[in-house]
Each structure stands twice: as C-alpha cells, then as structure tokens.
Amino acid sequence: MPKVAFLGDSISAGLHLAEDQAFPALLAQRMRGQPHAFRLINAGVSGDTTAGGLRRADWILKQRPDVVVVELGANDGLRGVPLDAIERNLRGILEKVRNAGAVPVVLGVRLPPSYGKEYVTGFEAIYPRLAHELGVAHVPFFMEGVAGAAEMNLEDGLHPTAKGHERLAANVEPALREAIASVKRAPQQP
C-alpha cells in the first residue's frame, strides 16, 4: 500500500479538530478498501511556512512516501514574506520530493485582496507556474468553497470546521487519486 505524506500547516494538521476530522485523514478514510488506498503520514504543523517545510522535507522523505502533498504558503503570504523566497522554498520542496522518487502534489493557496493587488496576484501565480515548470500535479485552489464561507470555518475565519475539511477532501481527492495511480517507483530497498 502506498504511503502519502501531507507536508502542510494548520489546515493539514486540522487545527482545533480531532485528528480524524482533518482532510488528510478524511482522504485516507474515503479511499480505504479501494485501489487508491494509502497509509497516511500527516506532517501538518500549525503555523508552518514554506521555509519550515523545506527544512522538514528531508525528515519526511526518510519515511519513504510514495506521494507528498504540499500544502504550504498561506502563513508566508499572511506574513508578507517576499514572493521570491516563497517560490524558492516551494521549488526546493517539490524538487526534493521528486528527486527522492516520490510524486509531488502542490495545493494552490490564495490570499485576501487586502494584501494588495500586486502581492496577491504574484503570490497566486507561484503555484501554477511551479506546477507547469516542474511538471507536478496541482490543485489550483484547494480551499475552493471553504475560504470566505462562514459556515465552513471556525470563528477565526481562517481554519475550516469539520464540514469545511470534508469539502477540502473532496477538492483534493481527484489529484491525489491520480498521483497514487501514477506511482511507478523502483522497489524500495530494505
């Protein structure tokens, strides 16, 4: 059974929810007993940034995942991290994943317009550009139907409720199924 790691922030971690209510666990539950079933490695860390994810990538790759879902960048954007640094870190993560023989999937993130048109536009362009340049799977906006929907988020307006996580799982599932199906790794060494 393939191993799927989620390298993410508080959204992957399921902040303020039970572990089995976070979208990575929901995806594992949905696919259990199916051809796309997988073992979950949830490496979501609340508050994590692309720089933190890049530092943690080697540790995650030591666990030999077949697929790595990268859900990072929101905390960078909310802190106004320079766009070139965000892109460099995401590129580094995706290249490490691919070089380790795993299939990367990058989840696109968006920012509120209050961060300024130039920054927001530049930020949102990073994900599809990297997906295209590196040839990796990409979910354009994995928070579609959740971001900005009060009934899908906790009182902070940033972190999804259990219902919101169900929608995230539905948004990510097609790309994850495709990534699992494409796993063509060489036999792992003992």
Regions found by a protein language model. Name each.
Residues 1-46, 56-64:
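Serine-esterase "nucleophile elbow" of acetyl-processing enzymes
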Residues 36, 52-190:
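Alpha-helical cap/lid subdomain in secreted, periplasmic
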Residues 47-51:
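N-terminal helical cap/lid subdomain that shapes the substrate entry/recognition surface
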